[in-house]
């Protein structure tokens, strides 16, 4: 990993490592997950979280098509996801896309907000980056402002 993810975390949020997570949770994703943070819940509950993922593009892949198609990828990856919205996110990231959706996990309704963008470096070429914020749907209103502010501060430094 030749890049660093920087984000100004909201109060009560902290960076996480693979050691902080249940065993096997990141199985098969170790090469793509670049950053994880979560809010420390007051009680045993689903913790609001941020997961930043980097996916290298192949030399024949069209970055624009990959960026737009990445919205479909989250729908295909998580059973029952319903996309609510997807729109350009130029105000957050040049060429970026902002999307939101809902799904149910272990009887808990969850809402996600995802920022996706393409970033190119001389050493790595083009990569798709996604920063996905997720929390219990009933708490989304309370966390949205913090999630949006964190997405504004998010940067990847090579």
Question: Where is each model-derived feature located?
Answer:
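Short aromatic-glycine motifs in intrinsically disordered, low-complexity regions
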Residues: 1-8
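Conserved polar/disulfide-associated segments of primarily extracytoplasmic proteins
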Residues: 3, 18-128
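Preference for bulky hydrophobic residues occupying beta-strand positions
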Residues: 7, 101-103, 133
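Surface-exposed amphipathic alpha-helical segments
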Residues: 11-13, 129-158
């Amino acid at each position: 990993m030749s890049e660093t993810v920087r984000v100004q975390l909201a109060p009560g949020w902290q960076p996480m490592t693979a050691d902080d997570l249940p065993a096997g949770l990141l199985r098969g994703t170790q090469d793509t997950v670049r950053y994880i943070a979560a809010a420390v819940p007051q009680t045993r509950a689903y913790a609001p979280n941020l997961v930043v993922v980097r996916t290298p593009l192949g030399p024949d892949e069209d970055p624009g098509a990959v960026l737009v198609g990445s919205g479909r990828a989250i729908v295909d990856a998580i059973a029952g996801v319903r996309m609510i919205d997807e729109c350009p996110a130029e105000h957050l990231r040049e060429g970026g896309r902002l999307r939101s959706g809902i799904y149910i996990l272990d009887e808990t309704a969850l809402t996600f907000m995802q920022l996706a963008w393409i970033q190119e470096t001389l050493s790595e070429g083009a990569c798709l980056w996604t920063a996905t914020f997720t929390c219990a749907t009933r708490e989304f209103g309370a966390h949205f402002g913090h999630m949006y502010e964190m997405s504004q501060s998010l940067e990847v430094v090579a």
